[in-house]
A protein has these predicted regions:
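Bacterial Sec-dependent N-terminal signal peptides
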Residues: 1-26, 291
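Subset of outer-membrane beta-barrel
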Residues: 23-371
Length: 371
């Protein structure tokens, strides 16, 4: 009952912040919303109810209690915007105590997103007004996140389980030598499983994750910023508003060799109206749908859609005609003994002018040594 009361208090904070959204940045720490693992990306990010491997630390930490027996790990690499942005992810989960029961599980996740070789044009123009391209230097922008996860079964038996999980996350962001930030936040999740059905709830940034930015400019850089009428920042705090994911999934065996799983997630934000399928001044809701077809638990095909948005129709010179667009996901998976190889083919733009990304990830079953 104490856990239930605490969870209700957490949920109430989502509605309280709707009256103070001026303090928050709508798109803060967006690198933490890219995803984890090619399986989840191929299914449109619909993983809140079904995640049950090392990637559950990202999608819903309550799902880590599904890791039984051996520790598991996952790694992923992806490149976005023709290789300009590089995204890396690694995670590990390990049962505590009796590994066959796994009522408690610990997880670790590392996330990095970076863009290198960004031109620094602060000194492009010499004092005499001439353009000197030799003055251009380059710098990198990198974002890091470290997630420590804990999950525990609240109650359960052979037919059903109800689990709770949480994340403590540390964030570090840097932009060349000019700006650096440290941040901290908490996530919490619930997951219920029973006879093919599963339900999940994931609350991200429940304590309004914060980043404290510090800026470091040389006297010469400050002079250029001043003369070009740019603001010279000293320190700032960036807040990320809470976000709620609700998911429901169902899995069934079609035949002796075929199985299917479908999941629907609702991504709820409380920081004002967003360009999503359902929106209001207080609440915005973006659906995510994913389907997986498995053959002999060895070969998998996956399909997903998410990120519904309304945009201007291509070729419309009046900028008045709007169409609904979405991001599709497509992927396959192979199981080879203790390793799962997953691939996803995703779209980062609208349907008529797509930016495609190929994502490959691996999941490992770290078999324990026998005595």
């Amino acid at each position: 009952m104490k856990l239930t009361r605490n969870w209700l208090l957490v949920m109430s904070s989502f509605w309280m912040i709707s009256n103070a959204n001026a303090q928050f940045r709508k798109y803060s720490n967006e690198f933490l919303n890219i995803g984890a693992g090619a399986k989840g990306l191929a299914m449109g990010g619909a993983q809140t109810a079904s995640a049950g491997d090392a990637t559950a630390g990202y999608w819903n930490p309550a799902g880590l209690t599904e890791v039984k027996g051996n520790p598991v790990a996952a790694i992923m690499h992806a490149e976005y915007f023709a290789g300009i942005g590089k995204y890396d992810y690694a995670a590990m989960a390990m049962p505590i105590g009796d590994p066959t029961i796994a009522t408690r599980t610990l997880g670790l996740s590392l996330i990095r997103f970076a863009v290198d070789d960004i031109p620094n044009t602060l000194f492009l123009v010499d004092p005499d007004g001439s353009v000197n391209y030799n003055n251009i230097r380059s710098f990198s922008s990198a974002d890091y996140a470290f997630l420590l996860s804990y999950a525990q079964v609240i109650f359960g038996d052979e037919s059903k389980t109800f689990s709770f999980g949480s994340n403590a996350k540390i964030i570090h962001r840097s932009v060349g030598s000019f700006a650096k930030a440290w941040g901290f936040g908490l996530d919490a999740g619930l997951q219920y499983r029973s006879k093919g059905f599963s339900f999940g709830l994931m609350a991200k940034d429940i304590t309004t994750t914060f980043n404290v930015w510090n800026f470091n400019f040389s006297d010469r850089e400050k002079e250029v910023l001043y003369l070009t009428k740019n603001e010279i920042p000293v320190q700032s705090t960036e807040l990320t508003a809470p976000r709620l994911f609700i998911g429901a999934a169902y899995s069934s065996e079609i035949s002796e060799n075929l199985a299917i799983q479908g999941e629907l997630n609702l991504d709820l934000t409380f920081d004002g109206k967003r360009n999503v399928l359902f929106r209001s001044n207080t609440l915005s809701m973006d659906p995510r749908l994913g389907v997986e077809l498995g053959y002999k638990k060895l070969l998998y095909g996956r399909l997903g859609i998410f990120n519904f948005q309304q945009g201007l129709k291509d070729g419309d010179t009046t900028n008045l005609k709007k169409v609904w667009i979405f991001q599709p996901g497509l992927g396959v998976g192979f199981k080879l003994k203790q390793v799962d190889i997953d691939y996803a083919f995703t779209n980062l733009a609208n349907q008529s002018n797509p930016l495609y990304t190929h994502v490959v990830s691996l999941r490992f079953n770290l078999k324990r040594k026998e005595n």
